[in-house]
């Protein structure tokens, strides 16, 4: 799915005419700031049928105060949106303390019963152990170049991995996206969930230690396929170039890997993911 994330910088954006499967909207920052245009943006997103998320930008002012401010602000929309925590270095006095971030994730889950996504730069994924955060779905960001672009189903990422996570569920690949219906820059994202899987996060029906990972079949094109290709190649099941495209060579190598583990389906389902983790 293709989508955007917005804040007060996109005040007045008409989400009815900007093409996107989903939109993630800044709600709050710190213990008192509410993003300008938040209520209008989230109300319109829901009214025009967009899959919708909201995020809080952490600033280190105190876990309880930040989470309380976030949850009280988004309360009218709580059962309709996914929740995200934005963890960046700018205007965040606790950025070097990854345990503060993990405490915020746990506090959001405790107050809402829902599992929040964690947004951060891909490089930050590798800076800390993230013992607890790794159990929360990752929304990672990395840009190859700052040139205007539109959606792509195969965004660039480096080969350094995502630290404690195998892959992100949402990936932000540009801050200078250009889409019809809006004349200025937009953050562009790709989401590797299905619409139903997204909705399960809005309802709080996902288990913390069992993040959704998609079923992969012949013809699929995404970063999950690329990760499997890299894994197969690294473990002696050569499938050629790790291009993110699930073709015949990838399927043949996968079948050999599965046969060596007592199964053979030719696609990546939950059993294959579980075997990969074991």
Where are these regions (language model features)?
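Acidic/polar residues in short coil/turn loops that connect beta-strands
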Residues: 243, 265-266
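Functionally critical loop-and-helix segments that line ligand-binding/catalytic clefts
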Residues: 1-17, 133-210
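Catalytic domains of cell-wall/extracellular-matrix polysaccharide-remodeling enzymes
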Residues: 81-158
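Acidic, Ser/Thr/Pro/Gly-enriched interdomain connector segments
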Residues: 7, 203-244
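Substrate-binding cleft of extracellular glycoside hydrolase catalytic domains
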Residues: 1-114
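Conserved hydrophobic/aromatic packing and binding residues within compact polymer-binding modules
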Residues: 254
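Sec/Tat-exported extracytoplasmic proteins
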Residues: 27, 46, 74, 108-112, ...
């Amino acid at each position: 799915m293709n989508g955007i994330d917005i804040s007060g910088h996109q005040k007045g954006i008409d989400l009815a005419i900007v093409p996107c499967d989903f939109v993630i909207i800044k709600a709050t920052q710190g213990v008192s700031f509410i993003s300008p245009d938040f209520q209008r943006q989230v109300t319109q997103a829901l009214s025009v049928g967009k899959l919708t998320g909201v995020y809080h930008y952490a600033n280190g002012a105190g876990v309880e105060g930040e989470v309380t401010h976030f949850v009280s602000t988004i309360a009218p929309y709580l059962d309709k949106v996914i929740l995200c925590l934005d963890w960046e270095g700018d205007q965040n006095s606790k950025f070097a303390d990854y345990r503060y971030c993990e405490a915020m994730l746990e506090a959001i889950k405790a107050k809402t019963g829902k599992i929040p996504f964690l947004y951060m730069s891909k490089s930050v994924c590798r800076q800390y152990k993230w013992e607890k955060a790794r159990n929360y779905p990752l929304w990672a960001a990395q840009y190859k170049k700052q040139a205007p672009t539109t959606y792509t189903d195969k965004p660039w990422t480096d080969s350094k991995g995502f630290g404690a996570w195998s892959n992100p569920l949402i990936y932000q690949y540009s801050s200078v996206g250009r889409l019809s219906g809006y004349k200025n820059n937009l953050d562009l994202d790709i989401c590797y969930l299905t619409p139903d899987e997204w909705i399960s996060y809005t309802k709080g029906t996902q288990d913390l230690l069992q993040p959704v990972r998609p079923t992969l079949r012949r013809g699929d094109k995404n970063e999950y396929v690329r990760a499997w290709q890299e894994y197969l190649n690294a473990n002696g099941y050569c499938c050629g170039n790790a291009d993110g495209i699930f073709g015949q060579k990838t399927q043949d190598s996968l079948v050999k890997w599965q046969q060596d583990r007592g199964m053979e389906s030719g696609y990546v389902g939950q059993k294959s993911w579980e075997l990969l983790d074991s």
